[in-house]
Amino acid sequence: MKNFDNTYFQNYQFAINSLPSVSCIIDGKVMKPGEHFLVDAACPDVKGTFRLLPFSYTNAVDKELLFAKLKQGLLPNEALLMKNAEDNRQFRRFVDTLDSMGFKIPLIVKSVSKKLLWTTSQQLEKIPMLTFPDTIIKNTDEITVDIDSKFIPAYGCRNIIGYLPGKNKNTKGYVVFTAHYDHLGMLGNNAYFPGASDNASGTSMILSMANYYAKNKQDYPIVFILFSGEEVGLLGSKYFVEHPLFSLQKIKMLVNVDIMGSAEAGITVVNGEQFKSAFDQLVDINKREAYLPEIKIRGKAANSDHYFFSEAGVPSIFIYSNGGPGYYHDVWDKPNTLNFKNYDNVAKLLVQFIKELK
């Protein structure tokens, strides 16, 4: 494997909020972060025992009562228990509105019926916020929390890049395989988000492709890129597009893979509508070889590291597998939950796709 500019690494930095220590106690029971509750990724420090005041921000009457209470002022040991907070973006806008109005809120506790999904944040909010399933928090009157946050304005990260030279030195253009190797990390000292499906499985696929092409050289160079910063907002791939180690115009096709651990129901091709000939080629190969039960098409989406390449005019598709238990951005996304059904067949499909690439 060769490198560009005498290094396999591309270093850069971004801001990130971290939560090195979190604890929560309800009715004398220690709650497990990641399983029983989540701390908002942008949460500041908060410590104390709080009495929960229940409101529904989607109910007009409750909303009036809420604003009346906020105008009166919350005590330092009072927290808002917000029910029916299912739409995270809508609720965040609501909280931002409360903050912009100058209300002092010691703590917000969200109650949701759907599964807990964690994320990351590049900023530190003023109002601490926790999320619980309805089943845990609905009959709770009091909560004790101790959350320590650490905002890092310039966290060092790196992309990993290498390539295999082509057999024909006169052949112009690269084929590029990409995946992100980062995930969410830790929430406190004990809650680990493994990211087996998202995206250790995609990283594994890149290594599988590199192993194959190291033994089966092509006429043209093949580049392999593992991005960091995907979970923070596609930052690694954005940085690479803005600071490319080779001309992006030389890329014949970029294939980004994510969530490759369970393809019993086939795969989906994002940007398939934008690059229909590439999608049709994948479908034609699959009809001949019967690698997968189905290949679905999707349009443009800023949901993985292909995005900024395609925005820069690079022919780019993003492939993810369909099937498996569906663990995603949670503490249950572990290696033993992946069955790797059709994993080898996805690799064979990609090899044949590149072989027939025009």
Describe the residue ranges of each PLM region:
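His/Asp/Glu-rich mid-to-C-terminal helical/loop segments that flank catalytic regions of hydrolases
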Residues: 211, 326-358
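Structural recognition of the beta-strand scaffold that forms the well-ordered cores
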Residues: 8, 78-82, 105-109, 161, ...
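Second-shell loop/turn segments in exported
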Residues: 39-40, 52-60, 81-86, 93, ...
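Metal-dependent peptidase/peptidase-like ectodomains
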Residues: 218, 227-327
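Noncatalytic luminal/extracellular "stalk/propeptide" segments of secretory-pathway proteins
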Residues: 1-79
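Solvent-exposed loop/turn segments at secondary-structure junctions
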Residues: 13-16, 85-88, 112-115, 168-169, ...
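A conserved hydrophobic secondary-structure block that centers on an alpha-helix together
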Residues: 60-104, 108-114
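Soluble metallo-hydrolase cores and metallopeptidase-like ectodomains found primarily
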Residues: 33, 44-52, 57-64, 111-194, ...
